[in-house]
Amino acid sequence: MPVRGSIPKTMKALVAYSKDDYRLELAYPTPECGPDDIIIKTEACGICAGDLKCKHGAAMFWGDDIQPSWVKPPFIPGHEFYGTIVQMGENVEGYELGEKITADQIVPCGKCRFCKDGHYWMCQPHDMYGFMNYTNGGMAEYVRYGKTSVISKLPKDMPLEQAALVEPYGCSKHAVDRAEITNEDVVVISGAGTLGLGMITYARMKNPKKLIVLDMQDNRLELAKKFGADLVFNPGKCDVDKEIKALTDGYGCDIYIEATGNPASVVQGLTVIRKLGTFVEFSVFGKETTVDWSIIGDRKELDIRGAHLSPYAYPFVIENMMNGNLKTEGVITRILPIEEWEKGFDLASGREGDLKVVLKFD
């Protein structure tokens, strides 16, 4: 059976040639559909903090004297995207033209040790959408999903304001799950950006004893309260350590989830957390972070846990967005056409108070 569906030969695409050279191409070649591939017409793509840090030249992406470059230019950025199936290879089964779908950011190999034991999000050789030229991302009119892509179907009536948040909310869910929250825990979430808000609305479903949110922007803290925070504090306006210790008989919080990528937030977490507490880190850092490891080991014997991507999270996120359990209203603050990508990247920095900025396609 031949390839089903058709697409034009060229498309609009934002292409990263280097950290200082991002260009909107108006006639970039569309992806070719192999026998195991699915091509979607992109509806929208969110701009992530990782996209910003990549464009700003963070060493973890472009390398430095210590580490090699990880990205593979020229590539099309964007991993928070979804779209409608417009073309499918002859071997593809279980999907139909016109269905709305999205996929995990990681493209696992399916063969390595981690993939075989079910930890596909930690795939050793893995590819990632939006950073490599053989897995181009969603800031283009068309995107190719390969055979090992982890695809999830979206309801036809799911609005952009929810569909564009499935990927970041999947990451939020995984981070909260790593914390293993119980109803006896005092939980602190540092950061009320998109990821932090996703963590707050999901953590509320865990019914912790108290859910405390920290952020330097008061408008984000107001939204955090609407999403389920019991208490909010601005570290720039109060002594967070004093406030949290006062609420916990001087012990500190049971769980601290770091969602800012700011070194000061890491140090803050090690201060406000109690002995034998659980510290979860989910952030991309733009620079090195130094902490006193004696706090982690000798003084507090902390349980330090990382959180990476959004494994097995999409079905839950999609269902609970649609039924209203996961709040999304107010997270997407700006929707712009791809032609205004420079404005979008600028606003995504939060300088005008924006949260999630999304690029939309016709």
Where are these regions (language model features)?
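Mid-domain Rossmann-like dinucleotide-binding core that forms the NAD(H)/NADP(H) cofactor-binding site
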Residues: 141, 156-238, 242
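C-terminal substrate-binding/catalytic core of Rossmann-like NAD(P)-dependent dehydrogenases/reductases
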Residues: 241-246, 286-334, 342-343, 349-354
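Short, well-ordered coil/turn residues at beta-beta hairpins
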Residues: 44, 104, 257-259, 361
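NAD(P)H dinucleotide-binding glycine-rich loop of Rossmann-like/cofactor-binding domains
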Residues: 67-74, 79, 109-190
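Conserved acidic E/D residue at the C-terminus of a beta-strand in Rossmann-like folds
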Residues: 215, 283, 308
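Glycine-rich beta-strand-centered segment in the early N-terminal region that forms part
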Residues: 31-45, 60-113, 155-157
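Glycine-rich cofactor phosphate-binding loops and adjacent beta1-alpha1 units
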Residues: 179-182, 206, 222, 226-303, ...
